[in-house]
Amino acid sequence: MRDRLLAAEKVKAIDWRDDALYLLDQRVLPFEEVWHRYTTAAGVAEAIRTMVVRGAPAIGISAAYGAVLGARARIAEGGDWYPALEEDMQLLADSRPTAVNLFWALNRIRDRLMRVKNGDNPLAALEAEAVAIHLSDREANLTMAQLGADLIRKHQGNLQTVLTHCNTGALATGGFGTALGVIRAAHLEGMIERVYADETRPWLQGSRLTAWELANEGIPVTLNADSAAAHLMRTKGITWVIVGADRITANGDVANKIGTYQLAVAAMHHGVRFMVVAPSSTIDMEMASGDDIIIEERDGRELLEVGGQRVGADVEAFNPVFDVTPADLIDAIVTEKGIVERPDTARMAQLMSRKHLH
């Protein structure tokens, strides 16, 4: 299956070459394919903040490479460069506060720096660590894809009609995808009849990115308004809702793109299974529950302006980027370490004590 999954991969969003980070600008897809070249930590932080790159795993990978770029510049300046590099990493950390992969990746860079011995090349060590983070995410995606497809087969052997939210494919990760990776694997095994993709307002990641990725691979996809999701579950035979995650807490609560929580509520009401797919780097065992998660809010103009025109002078906007889905609404969390069905604190702790499967 691994070879079939790799052969099906057609899209990537991150490229590290010639001492620079190249990012596919996801703000202009699918209308244009524009790559930007970054050579500074500040530039990468701005790319994350402005959503040139998005998706929790992709953000973490980009931040790791951003730290390498920062180290190169600071070492070239001479002197005691570590405090200046720490400032660069803090700038990267501040770019998106909810995606725990960002902090996980930067902490791995810090840990690697602490292990550099006298006479070692610190820049080479940090670059190797960033590349390892990138490659391990790709391998995790392949493992999760197979585990998720196996879970679908275990519960329901017939053709599946799946609903997904936001974008969780190759564009959001180091390769292949999380939730979309599971859908790809299930399609390769002949289990997917159709995928419904929420448009995912206000950035339209579902319509611009997910529908584009699926259509490019010949997977039957139908785009729907976010507000049609419950109606779809009632009338179109949805069998699974499959989503990604930006942070998973110690008790199994999940922070993901705004709109995920209402999908889980509707799925519970309609008897539709709800699967979350994310690498273990998304799990924050230091955070007890979703009540502790800081929810990022973006500029209200994303909602208040249509075609460049403001909808109302005296209208305010509430524009959270994420919401929190309680663990008791989730049927399964799929990671590269394994699957947790009906997640709770004890089951999450057991999962995180395992070694990686890949």
Curated annotation (Swiss-Prot):
Annotated pathway: Amino-acid biosynthesis; L-methionine biosynthesis via salvage pathway; L-methionine from S-methyl-5-thio-alpha-D-ribose 1-phosphate: step 1/6
Active site: D246
Any Gene Ontology biological process: L-methionine salvage from methylthioadenosine
EC number per UniProt: 5.3.1.23
Binding site for substrate: R54, G55, A56, R96, Q205, N256, K257
Positions of the record's site feature: Transition state stabilizer: C166
Pfam families registered for this protein in UniProt: IF-2B
First-tier enzyme category under EC: isomerase
Recorded catalytic activity of this chain's protein: 5-(methylsulfanyl)-alpha-D-ribose 1-phosphate = 5-(methylsulfanyl)-D-ribulose 1-phosphate
Domain of life: Bacteria
Keywords linked to the UniProt accession: Amino-acid biosynthesis, Isomerase, Methionine biosynthesis
GO molecular function: S-methyl-5-thioribose-1-phosphate isomerase activity
HAMAP family linked to this entry: Salvage_MtnA
Assigned protein family: Belongs to the eIF-2B alpha/beta/delta subunits family. MtnA subfamily.
Chain's role: Catalyzes the interconversion of methylthioribose-1-phosphate (MTR-1-P) into methylthioribulose-1-phosphate (MTRu-1-P).
Full protein name: Methylthioribose-1-phosphate isomerase
Organism: Pseudomonas syringae pv. tomato (strain ATCC BAA-871 / DC3000)
